[in-house]
Amino acid sequence: MLISRNKLILLLGIVFFERGKSATLSLPKAPSCGQSLVKVQPWNYFNIFSRILGGSQVEKGSYPWQVSLKQRQKHICGGSIVSPQWVITAAHCIANRNIVSTLNVTAGEYDLSQTDPGEQTLTIETVIIHPHFSTKKPMDYDIALLKMAGAFQFGHFVGPICLPELREQFEAGFICTTAGWGRLTEGGVLSQVLQEVNLPILTWEECVAALLTLKRPISGKTFLCTGFPDGGRDACQGDSGGSLMCRNKKGAWTLAGVTSWGLGCGRGWRNNVRKSDQGSPGIFTDISKVLPWIHEHIQTGNRRKSSRAWCSEQDVIVSGAEGKLHFPESLHLYYESKQRCVWTLLVPEEMHVLLSFSHLDVESCHHSYLSMYSLEDRPIGKFCGESLPSSILIGSNSLRLKFVSDATDNAARFNLTYKALKPNYIPDSGCSYLTVLFEEGLIQSLNYPENYSDKANCDWIFQASKHHLIKLSFQSLEIEESGDCTSDYVTVHSDVERKKEIARLCGYDVPTPVLSPSSIMLISFHSDENGTCRGFQATVSFIPKAGKKIELPTLWFPVLILVM
């Protein structure tokens, strides 16, 4: 860990961030991730700048998730504990598979020159390197997972760091901390005692601009940059694989990045003219960019409890290409009153989620309900009642489910399965599932431009972001005509309860565009058993407008029932 001093650089962003880092921050009392024995120091102007300008030796127990990856008892890289059996490190640390059998992982490490009280050392059972990592381009996807042959026992000096929540990011200017036993000066010796240094996160534009000045410009998708243009504070050789950690809104330490690479140690890049003296920002693998991959491979303690009956306020990650979610997990279990349970479903990137209920027994939505949110927390609806909903296809790879119980109903339960499907698995029809989409696009009746089938019932729900309206524009419309459009027809609603009908269409004339007054649009197509036509084709677009807050719609089943 480089700790050489440099001239004082006054950054307003540092002052702004550190004001929030006060003694009033408190961590949960119950054992959980991101907790440290060392209390956060009260904020004051001089304390902050004394820490930013140089690195410093940490107090024992400051970062209980920090591990030392050792080859034949010699420190080579760092890592971060995220569960009793799993450690995250840099892929380049273990890219040579031949050395894995010679590696140990030591938790509770503080002073490399001695055996510290509370140290625990385990061997490695499994190594998982990100499939997109390449030694030819080692700065991209530089991350690996290590499964221990055994489990760390959590205590004062050993514990996990938090993984970020979905879509949780630490913005440019945020001051984070990296720690390790790396070299104290470029080309110098390793530090025997754990060191730390605080570094600001740079904007992507600053990062790219700095890297473009190098002799061999670096590109990638999964890294973030930290540091100061004039240098002086940085990670260094031996710190690789360690953590870039930031405090989240609740004050818990969260793994924002994995130490990856840098040109030199603490070199500035403001004047990268002479090739021999060029420097770069500190490069870290951005955890938010690879979070779905991490959850896909790691079974954390919480994940194994994904169906527990008492789960108030926890957010459980349930991931994989397919799986089941039963709540409660047994017919003999009941949840306590006034509970809130949260699950985040993750399927592989660039896939969509298909949900199918096999059991639903939840009383009126006024008391207990299961609500559903999309990517970016856009509300989809509430599920209640006893009639099974139709299968639901969600146009994203993530989904958040929230179950809320009242003070009396502790017998409600639901069972569902989830499965990853490729986009357009059932292209454009809306007839096999209730299809929920969050992007603009083209929809059309089943079999278009051929005739649609008899007895079709098809539904699409489009959900725009806040402050947007939805516009439906028809390219063609050929639907059996009736006086009041009750035989074959397209209906458009601005709610999912079908209470606010804004259009009912049939016949052979292309109608004018239909505009929903809200950020929700339900489009339905129905045909009877008496003859068919070509159907319709239309595009859906989102129009920016200062809008009202989106109220969470309620899906009162069996209202939205699809019948093939």
UniProtKB/Swiss-Prot annotation:
Residues covered by the CUB domain: 311-421, 431-543
A Pfam family annotated for this UniProt entry: CUB
Peptidase S1 domain boundaries: 52-299
GO biological process, alphabetically ordered: fertilization; proteolysis
InterPro entries, per database record: CUB_dom (IPR000859), Peptidase_S1_PA (IPR009003), Peptidase_S1_PA_chymotrypsin (IPR043504), Peptidase_S1A (IPR001314), Sperma_CUB_dom_sf (IPR035914), Trypsin_dom (IPR001254), TRYPSIN_HIS (IPR018114), TRYPSIN_SER (IPR033116)
Signal peptide: 1-22
Annotated binding of Ca(2+), by residue: 119
Recorded family membership: Belongs to the peptidase S1 family.
Name of this chain's protein: Ovochymase-2
